[in-house]
Amino acid sequence: TILIGHSFGSFVSQGYIEKYGSNIDACILCGTAGPRIALASIGNCFANLIRLFRGPNAIVPMLAKLTFGSYCKRIENPETEDDWLSLSKPNRMMYKMDNWCGIPLTVSFFCDLTAGLKKIHKAKNIKKVPTDLPILFIWGAEDPVGSYGKTIRNLADIYKKNGVKSVEMIEYPNDRHEILNEDDKEKVETDILNYLAKI
C-alpha cells in the first residue's frame, strides 16, 4: 500500500504516517511543507479569534490573503492571484473557469488548517514516523507552499535525524505547485513509477 498526498492532502498524509505509518509500504509527499510552528500558532490564534466574533462559516478574505497573498511574489507580472499554482497558462485558465476551484474558504477551514499544522509538526509527533517507512518528497522549485523547497528539505532532514532510513527528494526546476499537471507531468509520473518499482 502506497500513500500519496498532494498539497493539503500531503499534510493529512504527514499526520497519517505519524499515527499509522506501519500500515503502509511507502509515502510520497507532493507539494508539501515542513514545520513553521510559530507561524501556524499565530495563525491559529488569529483565526480562532475571528471565529469567536464572526462565526465558523464566515468568509473573511483577509485570512486567505494572509495565507496565500505572498505566493506570487517571485512571479514577474502575475496575471491572477492564483498564478503560483502552475507554470502552464492553459492550466491556470482551466482553474479559473472551474466552479469547483478557488472557492471561498471559511474561518473554520483556517482554524482547522493551522491547528492541524501545529499538531503534525510537533517534534514528538514527527518522531512517531516509523524508521523503516520509505518517504519520497517531490515538489516544484517555484512552489511557494514549501518555501521553494526550504521547509521541505528541513522536514526531510528531521526525518533522517529521527532515524528514517530511506528519505528521497526530487525537485522539478521551474515547476510551481501543481507538478502533477505541469507540462513535464510525464517526467514526474515516470519518477513516481520508478520510485515505486524500487519499493
Predicted segments with their positions:
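Catalytic active-site module of serine/aspartate enzymes centered on a nucleophile-bearing elbow/loop
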Residues: 162, 166-199
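Alpha/beta-hydrolase-fold enzymes
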Residues: 13-100
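Conserved alpha/beta-hydrolase "acid-adjacent" motif
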Residues: 144-154
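Active-site nucleophile elbow and catalytic-triad environment of alpha/beta-hydrolase enzymes
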Residues: 105-127
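Short, proline-enriched alpha-helix->beta-strand connector loops that line the catalytic pocket
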Residues: 129-135, 162-165
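Short beta-strand/loop motif that positions the catalytic acidic residue
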Residues: 137-139
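Alpha/beta-hydrolase fold nucleophile elbow
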Residues: 1-7
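Acidic beta-to-alpha connecting loop that harbors the catalytic carboxylate
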Residues: 141-144, 175-176
